[in-house]
Amino acid sequence: MVMAYFVENFWGEKNSGFDVLYHNMKHGQISTKELADFVRERATIEEAYSRSMTKLAKSASNYSQLGTFAPVWDVFKTSTEKLANCHLDLVRKLQELIKEVQKYGEEQVKSHKKTKEEVAGTLEAVQTIQSTTQALQKSKENYNAKCVEQERLKKEGATQREIEKAAVKSKKATDTYKLYVEKYALAKADFEQKMTETAQKFQDIEETHLIHIKEVIGSLSNAIKEIHLQIGQVHEEFINNMANTTVESLIQKFAESKGTGKERPGLIEFEECDTASAVEGIKPRKRKTFALPGIIKKEKDAESVECPDADSLNIPDVDEEGYSIKPETNQNDTKENHFYSSSDSDSEDEEPKKYRIEIKPMHPNNSHHTMASLDELRVSIGNITLSPAISRHSPVQMNRNLSNEELTKSKPSAPPNERGTSDLLAWDPLFGPSLDSSSSSSLTSSSSARPTTPLSVGTIVPPPRPASRPKLTSGKLSGINEIPRPFSPPVTSNTSPPPAAPLARAESSSSISSSASLSAANTPTVGVSRGPSPVSLGNQDTLPVAVALTESVNAYFKGADPTKCIVKITGDMTMSFPSGIIKVFTSNPTPAVLCFRVKNISRLEQILPNAQLVFSDPSQCDSNTKDFWMNMQAVTVYLKKLSEQNPAASYYNVDVLKYQVSSNGIQSTPLNLATYWKCSASTTDLRVDYKYNPEAMVAPSVLSNIQVVVPVDGGVMNMQSLPPAIWNAEQMKAFWKLSSISEKSENGGSGSLRAKFDLSEGPSKPTTLAVQFLSEGSTLSGVDFELVGTGYRLSLIKKRFATGRYLADC
């Protein structure tokens, strides 16, 4: 029991103790708010650190996998990921603590309002005694003055009338003084009683407040302590793993994985030449003038073993590149009897009259040549499209017998390694289907002519699939993360990239070319495209622009408790300009201002426009829309800079704005998750429940390309799963792949992934699983876009959302 400090120490001459205690109670609300801000700042720091650690773990997985040191990176990666998860877990606990403090603050405000009403009587008593004290002091001073005046008149021998008059005033002052003394006594008694009760009430409130605040601080310190214990365990595990990763084990693993065989070269004995089997008239071999030393073509005639004198040789003529020139012989006889090929390596000289020398085309199995030909075919086909108003047509026929050599003459191909780098986000239906499989087969096999019109430089056509992002293989799903792009103008390399979509997330500029008919037939787009849009007409034409709305949903599920789900949804808007528009902007000193409106923003918490290029009016009062306009001078300068960096690009992308969507916990996740682990020394049972949540989307859409990855330790020897999964023993991860989930799926999009693992070094430790999916044609926020004013038209709008970090713990 705390002593009554407030009752004993807040009286005083001026009776101001009540005012001090009341304001002290109000200061408790300020301290509660400041404590919440402090915890929130700590959570922000921990979240930033967790993101940095996750990025570091991802970079560790991208380091060189060559050499004996390569397995050590897996140890670093695992340890760093666990550290990141520790700090992420602390973030979750701190966010829960913040909610608790905020709830307490709301209750505190209500309690203080109630207390204010209860102590209103004490406030009146304080005011009464203060006013009575002042009146008493004045009456006392008046009484003393009248008494002194009466005595002075008596001593000075004043008239009787003056003395009587002074006596009346003195008596009146005496009565007033006595009256206020009595009033003060009553006010004092009432004040002391009420002030004692109120002071004790204020002390009780402060005790309760401080106890609760100390509990919050205790929860904070315990959370930090637990995380530090986990971090210590992670470091201890890292030390043990490094101790177990011996030099011998690293060398042994490298030898087993990269070894070239255990068989040593055998003995070869000298064999005498069998001269009896030699044939007369054998032709000698002679090295050509352009031959490379050490490279000798095998003999086609096994009997050529003797070398007669050089005088008996017939040396054929060679051209400037070193190839043998075909002699003038009977062509018919040659076709009937002989057909040989010669490479650019060393070869023997044979009699010209018996051979026909030809250079065959490159073997079709050459993968690099094939990829390059397909790339150039894509570029060639991408520049052939149907014009909306066909005036002149030129028939183009693509024959079956076009050789790879003929196709490669059209345009230099992109590097083949860039052709395979397509991830889930790169399957962009807005920009046309992939030409890797369909174009090379269906288009090249067409024998009918198609009326086409070649595109000008500034023509807008639906672009091909983006090839700017690497494929997220199942082995790298554990590092799923989307890092927002800064608004600063991106740096474009000087080398010409392969044709890519104008709205690809990883590029600021790209070249767009594909078949408009294919895109219209196979691509579900949002909005209406007017097809190719030439921008070389004049300044009075409406100029085409394309827009992409891309959102990323990040979620963290903890067991089956929906209240512990953490969700963050962000989005960005990218605008794409055709290259021909730069000439229109530069030729016109005052181009039309591009104004646009973002609609359905009621679910957005924050909108961050690109401050360098975009303006907005902060005084707009409409809660569901917001208007913006672009700084056309800055846009022109920026587009010219992009054009100088990459003059071959057909389109240039501009980051317009970014935004954050308000979330309501698990109700805002399109795919709900819950994980259950049952771990024993010999087996581990895993179940992942998932449920399609249409309420998270404004318009329910299909989730496609779902991938689930679960790390499982404990020395997995065998895995049984339903539906079938893939076990990667090297990475110790199980992978599930589902094509799509929607309301029309079985059980309304609900289901389970089950697996049983047989262990040799159990038990396993429950880990965090990661999920990836995407959805085309809609957004989670329902945000929409429209142009305002004249001078521009919206040729294409694309909407999509995909996962960022989508994790689940047990």
UniProtKB/Swiss-Prot annotation:
Residues 301-352, 403-537 are annotated as: Disordered. Keywords: Coated pit, Coiled coil, Disulfide bond, Endocytosis, Isopeptide bond, Membrane, Phosphoprotein, Ubl conjugation. GO terms for cellular component: clathrin-coated pit; clathrin-coated vesicle; plasma membrane; presynapse. It holds the Pfam family GMIP-like_FCH. One of its GO terms (biological process) is clathrin coat assembly. It is a peripheral membrane protein. Residues 3-250 form the F-BAR domain. There is a cross-link at residue 297 (Glycyl lysine isopeptide (Lys-Gly) (interchain with G-Cter in SUMO2)). GO terms for molecular function: phosphatidylinositol binding; phosphatidylinositol-4,5-bisphosphate binding; phosphatidylserine binding. Residues 521-810 are annotated as: Mediates interaction with DAB2, EPS15, EPS15R and ITSN1. Residues 542-809 form the MHD domain. Residues 87-156 form a coiled coil. Ubiquitinated. Mainly undergoes monoubiquitination but also polyubiquitination. Residues 3-274 are annotated as: Mediates dimerization and binding to membranes enriched in Pi(4,5)-P2 and induces their tubulation. The modification Phosphoserine is found at residues 312, 387, 394, 403, 488, 493, 496, 508, 510-511, 533. Functions in an early step of clathrin-mediated endocytosis. Has both a membrane binding/bending activity and the ability to recruit proteins essential to the formation of functional clathrin-coated pits. Has a lipid-binding activity with a preference for membranes enriched in phosphatidylserine and phosphoinositides (Pi(4,5) biphosphate) like the plasma membrane. Its membrane-bending activity might be important for the subsequent action of clathrin and adaptors in the formation of clathrin-coated vesicles. Belongs to the FCHO family. This is F-BAR domain only protein 2.
